[in-house]
Amino acid sequence: MAKASFERTKPHVNIGTIGHVDHGKTTLTAAITKVLADQYPDLNEARAFDQVDNAPEEKERGITINVSHVEYQTEKRHYAHVDAPGHADYVKNMITGAAQMDGAILVVAATDGPMPQTREHVLLARQVGVPYIVVALNKSDMVDDEELLELVEFEVRDLLSSQDFDGDNAPVIPVSALKALEGDEKWVKSVQDLMAAVDDNVPEPERDVDKPFLMPVEDVFTITGRGTVVTGRVERGVLLPNDEIEIVGIKEKSSKTTVTAIEMFRKTLPDARAGENVGLLLRGTKREDVERGQVIVKPGSITPHTKFEAQVYILSKDEGGRHNPFYSNYRPQFYFRTTDVTGVITLPEGTEMVMPGDNTDMSVELIQPIAMEDRLRFAIREGGRTVGAGRVTKITA
């Protein structure tokens, strides 16, 4: 059977379920696939609860995470949906970015209201830049008291507002994932309403090719008689021959030059696009002017920095991480895109030390500048071994 080609006709959106353990994230994920498979049978196939629940292990930057990926379509959009069953998996997934979310469905049990993990997930969602949250008040079939439902809704809106989400206007949809799976009409409709709210409210993400050009430098070499070539995988944007570019990071000063040719496997290309591995021939650039770890960018689109705040997950001993805690002034390497840079860590006030398996905020000062922007991901390494992973939450200098 021929492999089905990926239809590019619809906007593609990455979404995930977040919320407290046992509030029904995985059941809701299964219910969405079933309801949509019944509603649009030619577009979808249902996934049973246990197909979502036994999430396969994935390695992301050396960290093992259990994450389930399902896909489904509404009339308007194609969705890729991630569900991390365990709380620790969810935290790791958010911070290491095994799955980038364009929006999230926050699952809150109407019988419980927001719980500690609900708060932590919403906080993390804000820190890692999830743009929009739609709320599913699950298990609503078990709450007869209308006032109680309203109270839970109020608490959830309050929680969203406290983390700078639009709590006043976020859609809050009472659902029953279990009843929807059982085919109860009222609750099947509730899941359809939920997906309509996701369609209408989660903003369509900007495609990578539409963003300003950025390519991390992986290798640099000289072609006699032609000049210096840098190779790497284009992270975003499109570059044309004779475009001006800027080389940013590692060195004190950024430099500008022109790309005279773009090549892939020794063939000349008309352009370089997001996702492609290419070689760029740089005009008048010496081999020693460029090095791995720098980035080739659209001029002025990104700046080099040495100081930032971050949210970090530290690997546990079982995950191959450190065996003992670390304190402020710890000096590991920070691996950004293609290279390691040493940095000094300052822990937040009130945090004396960080244990393996913890997640924490920290401030970092690097010894060399890195082309940096909010939410940029990095690994923390000691002698080439990954001991943590994090994201930039704020650039400070």
UniProtKB/Swiss-Prot annotation:
Residue positions binding Mg(2+): 26
Matches recorded under SUPFAM superfamilies: EF-Tu/eEF-1alpha/eIF2-gamma C-terminal domain, P-loop containing nucleoside triphosphate hydrolases, Translation proteins
Region (G4) residue spans: 138-141
An example Gene Ontology CC term for this record: cytosol
Region: G1, residue numbers: 19-26
Region (G2) residue spans: 62-66
Presence of keyword Nucleotide-binding: yes
Catalytic activity: GTP + H2O = GDP + phosphate + H(+)
Subcellular location, record wording: Cytoplasm
Keywords attached to this entry: Cytoplasm, Elongation factor, GTP-binding, Hydrolase, Magnesium, Metal-binding, Nucleotide-binding, Protein biosynthesis
Domain tr-type G stretches: 10-206
Enzyme nomenclature, EC number: 3.6.5.3
Predominant localisation class: cytoplasm
A single GO molecular function term of this UniProt record: translation elongation factor activity
CDD domains: EF_Tu (cd01884), EFTU_II (cd03697), EFTU_III (cd03707)
Chain spans, region G3: 83-86
Residues annotated for GTP binding in this entry: 19-26, 83-87, 138-141
UniProt-annotated stretches for the region G5: 176-178
InterPro entries: EF-Tu_GTP-bd, EF-Tu_GTPase, EFTu-like_2, EFTU_2, G_TR_CS, P-loop_NTPase, Small_GTP-bd, T_Tr_GTP-bd_dom
Function field: GTP hydrolase that promotes the GTP-dependent binding of aminoacyl-tRNA to the A-site of ribosomes during protein biosynthesis.
PANTHER family: ELONGATION FACTOR TU, MITOCHONDRIAL (PTHR43721:SF22), ELONGATION FACTOR TU-RELATED (PTHR43721)
Family: Belongs to the TRAFAC class translation factor GTPase superfamily. Classic translation factor GTPase family. EF-Tu/EF-1A subfamily.
Quaternary context: Monomer.
Full protein name: Elongation factor Tu
Protein source organism: Brevibacterium linens
